[in-house]
Amino acid sequence: MSNVYDILKERGYIKQLTHEEEIRELLGKEKISFYIGFDPTADSLHVGHFLQMMVMAHMQKAGHRPIALVGGGTGMIGDPTGKTDMRKMMTKEQIEHNCNCFKKQLAKIIDFSEDKAIMVNNADWLLNLNYIEFLREIGVHFSVNKMLTAECFKSRLEKGLSFLEFNYMLMQGYDFLELNRKYNCVMELGGDDQWSNILAGVDLIRRKESKSAYGMTFTLLTNSEGKKMGKTESGALWLDPEKTSPYEFYQYWRNVADADVEKCLRLITFLPMDEVRRLSSLEGAEINEAKKVLAFEVTKLIHGEEEAQKAKIAAEALFGGNAKDLGNMPTAYIDKNDLNNLLVDLLVKCEIFPSKSEARRLIKQGGLYLNDEKVTDMNLVVTEEHVTEDGIMIRRGKKNFNRIVVE
C-alpha cells in the first residue's frame, strides 16, 4: 500500500511540516491518531472546511484514525487567526447545535462507525480548568516574546488584542496535549493559517510528556489569483443544502476559471491522478468537460449521487441545452471590451433593464441572479470569470432569463 504522505504530497495538500522525514516514515509504518480542529461559529461547514475533510478522508483510507475536535470551549473565546476584530462570543446552546450539524456533514466522507473516527468537544476539559493550576502546568511553557512574533497576533497588535484572545494559543496547545494523553494522538493537521498554534501544541507535548508530536499544515483553497475559493455573491459556499442548494453548489464548480480546474480536481475530488492529469490537459472548449466532471464529483461527495445528477441535468437544460433551447432565450451581444464594467451598466446597455435604478431596485429586493448566483453587490463588476461557455446568464425573479454573449 502506498504511503498516504506521498498521496498528500502528489495531490498538493502539504504546505508545512514540523519534521518531514519523521512524518513520512511514521505514516508509512504505523497507524496513528491525528486531529483537526473545527471552530463552531456557524451551523454548517463551508468549502474552506471541505479541503480539511478531504485530508481526513485520505488519511482514514490509509488506516489512520481521524479525531474531529470541535472547539466548544475555544469557541467561547474566538480564534484571532486572520481576524481584524474580536469575535462575538457564543452561547453553549448555539455551540452544541453547531457541533451536531458538523458531525452529520463530516460523516458524508468520514466513517465514524466502530471508532474508526471520533468527534470530541474541547469544552469537556477546558470548561472545568482550574486557572491557577493551568497557569502553573501550561502557562509556564509559553514565552510571551515568542507568542508576539506569531503571525496570528502580529496583525492584531495595532488594532488591539484582548487578553481573552491571547489565551487562544495556550488553549489550542492544551487541546493537543489532552488528545495525546487520552487518545494517543500524535499529529495535528490544519490550514496554513494555524501553523503558529500547531507549533505551540507540538512543543508543549515534547516538553510535558517527553514524547514526539508532529504538525502538518495544508494549502488553503485559493484560485489562480490567490483569493480564497468558496465565496459567492451571496456569501460563503456552505455544505448545508438549506444554505447553498446542490444546484448552486454544482454551478459554482462548473464555472470555475480554466486555470483553477487542475487544482480543484487534485484537492477536492478522489479521482485518480492519471485522470486528473488527463482532464487538466484538455484545452479550449474541451476544458468545459473537465469542469462538468469536477462539478459532478464534488457535488456527489457532499450531496450524494442523486442530487448531483439532478443538478447536472438542471444545469444542462438551462446552460448547456441544445441550440434551439438557447435560441429561444432573449440574447444580447457585447464586445469583450464591454467586460470589466458595472453589472447595472451592462444590463442597461443590453436593454435588459430600462434604467440603472430599476436594476438596482431588483438587486435590493434579492431578485437578480448572475449565472444563478444571487447578486447582492450594487457595484458588482462583470469580468471574464463570469463568462460561461454559453455566455453570461441573467435571471430576473424565478423564470425570466436573458443571455449575454461575448463576441
Curated annotation (Swiss-Prot):
<dbReference type="GO" id="GO:0004831">
    <property type="term" value="F:tyrosine-tRNA ligase activity"/>
</dbReference>
<keyword id="KW-0963">Cytoplasm</keyword>
<dbReference type="InterPro" id="IPR036986">
    <property type="entry name" value="S4_RNA-bd_sf"/>
</dbReference>
<keyword id="KW-0694">RNA-binding</keyword>
<feature type="short sequence motif" description="'KMSKS' region">
    <location>
        <begin position="228"/>
        <end position="232"/>
    </location>
</feature>
<feature type="short sequence motif" description="'HIGH' region">
    <location>
        <begin position="40"/>
        <end position="49"/>
    </location>
</feature>
<dbReference type="InterPro" id="IPR054608">
    <property type="entry name" value="SYY-like_C"/>
</dbReference>
<dbReference type="GO" id="GO:0005829">
    <property type="term" value="C:cytosol"/>
</dbReference>
<feature type="binding site">
    <location>
        <position position="35"/>
    </location>
    <ligand>
        <name>L-tyrosine</name>
    </ligand>
</feature>
<comment type="subunit">
    <text>Homodimer.</text>
</comment>
<dbReference type="InterPro" id="IPR024088">
    <property type="entry name" value="Tyr-tRNA-ligase_bac-type"/>
</dbReference>
<dbReference type="Pfam" id="PF00579">
    <property type="entry name" value="tRNA-synt_1b"/>
</dbReference>
<dbReference type="InterPro" id="IPR014729">
    <property type="entry name" value="Rossmann-like_a/b/a_fold"/>
</dbReference>
<dbReference type="InterPro" id="IPR002305">
    <property type="entry name" value="aa-tRNA-synth_Ic"/>
</dbReference>
<protein>
    <recommendedName>
        <fullName>Tyrosine--tRNA ligase</fullName>
        <ecNumber>6.1.1.1</ecNumber>
    </recommendedName>
</protein>
<keyword id="KW-0030">Aminoacyl-tRNA synthetase</keyword>
<keyword id="KW-0648">Protein biosynthesis</keyword>
<comment type="function">
    <text>Catalyzes the attachment of tyrosine to tRNA(Tyr) in a two-step reaction: tyrosine is first activated by ATP to form Tyr-AMP and then transferred to the acceptor end of tRNA(Tyr).</text>
</comment>
<keyword id="KW-0436">Ligase</keyword>
<keyword id="KW-0547">Nucleotide-binding</keyword>
<dbReference type="Pfam" id="PF22421">
    <property type="entry name" value="SYY_C-terminal"/>
</dbReference>
<dbReference type="InterPro" id="IPR024107">
    <property type="entry name" value="Tyr-tRNA-ligase_bac_1"/>
</dbReference>
<dbReference type="GO" id="GO:0006437">
    <property type="term" value="P:tyrosyl-tRNA aminoacylation"/>
</dbReference>
<dbReference type="GO" id="GO:0003723">
    <property type="term" value="F:RNA binding"/>
</dbReference>
<feature type="binding site">
    <location>
        <position position="231"/>
    </location>
    <ligand>
        <name>ATP</name>
    </ligand>
</feature>
<dbReference type="InterPro" id="IPR001412">
    <property type="entry name" value="aa-tRNA-synth_I_CS"/>
</dbReference>
<feature type="domain" description="S4 RNA-binding">
    <location>
        <begin position="341"/>
        <end position="405"/>
    </location>
</feature>
<feature type="binding site">
    <location>
        <position position="168"/>
    </location>
    <ligand>
        <name>L-tyrosine</name>
    </ligand>
</feature>
<dbReference type="InterPro" id="IPR002307">
    <property type="entry name" value="Tyr-tRNA-ligase"/>
</dbReference>
<comment type="similarity">
    <text>Belongs to the class-I aminoacyl-tRNA synthetase family. TyrS type 1 subfamily.</text>
</comment>
<feature type="binding site">
    <location>
        <position position="172"/>
    </location>
    <ligand>
        <name>L-tyrosine</name>
    </ligand>
</feature>
<keyword id="KW-0067">ATP-binding</keyword>
<dbReference type="GO" id="GO:0005524">
    <property type="term" value="F:ATP binding"/>
</dbReference>
